């Protein structure tokens, strides 16, 4: 009896422990039943009873939750609700706090949706590290949808407004019905076989859960996951969510939003063009300065090395540098011209012709200045080489001989620069401009 007294519960304690047991063990559950005693007071909360043929349970759905319900519940309606058990301790009542509510028919589909979602998540099909980024410069979009639906009209309208240069290839498919999922899978596989687009946009307009059910196919989920092309899912309205949204690399809430996501504003393209031209101009200027420094270095080396060999090496290097400079300039101008033509073609429908003409003239002017500067530099270098050769020629021993002088050496090939170093009978060799003579010393006369 004493032990029993020590374990006496208060009412509050009992209700509290019952609450912990019910809420902790059951968690969130799905419950099917008929609505009765439905009320919607001014607070915006909903209060109702769910019952079957023999039992009933009180339920509450608060304002923040019931705003997502697409219909107004009525007494006698069969519904499927998802919620958690909660105990209202002051009265000792337990109730179901509803988080979502669907008509009974849609409710079965919702259960299947949740089950498939959990399965695919466990298999890793929704993992963030498997999502592929969108290409940076999208030129061609593959749209997988009905060719006659409202979705394709919305997509084409947005793309025509934002970036008319983007090409659209439609892979026609069913988007509703029993064979729609298989049809969508085939369209995705065809696009992956052809590899003619940069990204795929899977889309259709809004509808009921049953209308959109083909986008909750397990086979479609695996097809999207295995696609070599990035996939954007834009199915239904913003409140609609499908399995394809979870598997796709990116989800867009509507078809129009998907087209917005995959296109760039024309103003952004014009800005990118201006930036690209500026970078090319800076690159050309940097290349010119670099080559000028290299030419100056070669000129400095010429002055420090053996004249003839240095001249020969410098002439060879000069020719090589000239060819490389001409080739580099030609390639630069060719690449720049090609990029300008490509950008002009993309922007043609937006008619920025005046701006392109101005930039083209500036580019031609800069190219002309660069060509003139390089030609001037080459001419200056040639003049410096000719001057250096002339200077070397003026101090050459052969040049001295050409002016009427001669050079006399002894048998050891040492220059005979003084008579007191010679003796009678020595053999001497005297070199003139056009030949030499051998002589013998017969008389030595020193000058005082």
From Swiss-Prot:
Role: Bidirectionally degrades single-stranded DNA into large acid-insoluble oligonucleotides, which are then degraded further into small acid-soluble oligonucleotides.
Name the enzyme's class. Answer: hydrolase
What is the annotated quaternary arrangement, including any partners? Heterooligomer composed of large and small subunits.
Species source reads: Shewanella baltica (strain OS195)
Q: Which GO terms describe its biological process?
A: DNA catabolic process
One Pfam family hit: tRNA_anti_2
Task: Spell out the subcellular localization from the entry.
Answer: Cytoplasm
GO MF terms listed in the record are: exodeoxyribonuclease VII activity; nucleic acid binding
NCBIfam families of this UniProt entry? xseA
| The reaction(s) this protein catalyses | Exonucleolytic cleavage in either 5'- to 3'- or 3'- to 5'-direction to yield nucleoside 5'-phosphates
Which keywords are on file for this protein? Cytoplasm, Exonuclease, Hydrolase, Nuclease
Q: Which GO terms describe its cellular component?
A: cytoplasm; exodeoxyribonuclease VII complex
Q: What EC number(s) would the UniProt record show? A: 3.1.11.6
Predominant location category:
cytoplasm
What is the protein name stated in its UniProt record?
A: Exodeoxyribonuclease 7 large subunit
Q: Which family does it belong to?
A: Belongs to the XseA family.
